[in-house]
From Swiss-Prot:
Pathway: Lipid metabolism; phospholipid metabolism. Pfam families: G3P_acyltransf (PF02660). Keywords: Cell membrane, Lipid biosynthesis, Lipid metabolism, Membrane, Phospholipid biosynthesis, Phospholipid metabolism, Transferase, Transmembrane, Transmembrane helix. This is Glycerol-3-phosphate acyltransferase.
Length: 206
């Protein structure tokens, strides 16, 4: 394997390992978000525990980890798929060396990689996520359904690598959301405070 590819994979993993939510929480709020809410260090739990501003910052930072990593092949002038290099950042986000290998669910970082690989596909994926989130008011549902639909839509792009990576990530996202799936079945899944699902739950509790 080319030494540059190895170097890119290492850099990508280290970038992905940056625990944005943990660092933002500790530095600015004196909180380790892994001890609150769902215990996850990702964007959703950051919104829930630290608020909107911190959540947006962590979302952008987590996406940026994937975006920067996906740009490495262009920076190093190496002809290798940005998706494959981007996977190293996703792996780092899920198993971060800087946070005891307790990471997030890789949704934002995956989207960041997709932005570089195919902006059109990124736009489609983002639109699916937003629409699904508005309907369900559940980030978990939007993530799982979004990745599923993205995998199906990727078939129409005639890009084998994209389809394979999309399917692998979909399976992985479902595996990382198994606790959420149980809560969805029990009707106890956390909701964001907007959208049709949230309004329906609020109406039923009155």
């Amino acid at each position: 394997m080319d030494i540059k590819i190895i170097l890119m994979l290492i850099i990508g993993y280290l970038l992905g390992s940056i625990p944005s939510g943990v660092w933002i929480g500790k530095i600015f709020y004196n909180k380790d978000i892994r001890n609150y809410g769902s215990g996850n260090m990702g964007t959703t739990n950051t919104f829930r525990v630290l608020g909107k501003k911190a959540g947006i910052v962590v979302l952008l930072m987590d996406m940026l980890k994937g975006t920067i990593t996906a740009c490495l092949p262009f920076i190093f002038h190496v002809n290798v798929s940005v998706l494959l290099i981007g996977l190293s950042a996703i792996l780092g986000h899920v198993f971060p060396i800087f946070a005891g290998f307790r990471g997030g669910k890789a949704v934002a970082t995956s989207v960041g990689v997709l932005l570089v690989y195919n902006p059109l596909f990124f736009t489609i994926a983002w639109a699916i996520f937003i629409i699904t989130l508005y309907i369900s008011s559940m980030v978990s549902v939007a993530s799982m359904l979004g990745f599923t639909l993205v995998s199906i839509i990727s078939l129409f792009f005639n890009d084998r690598v994209l389809t394979i990576v999309a399917i692998v990530l979909t399976v992985f996202v479902f595996a990382r959301h198994w606790k959420n799936i149980e809560r969805i079945k029990n009707g106890t899944e956390n909701m964001v405070p907007f959208g049709l699902g949230y309004r329906r739950r609020q109406k039923n509790t009155k």
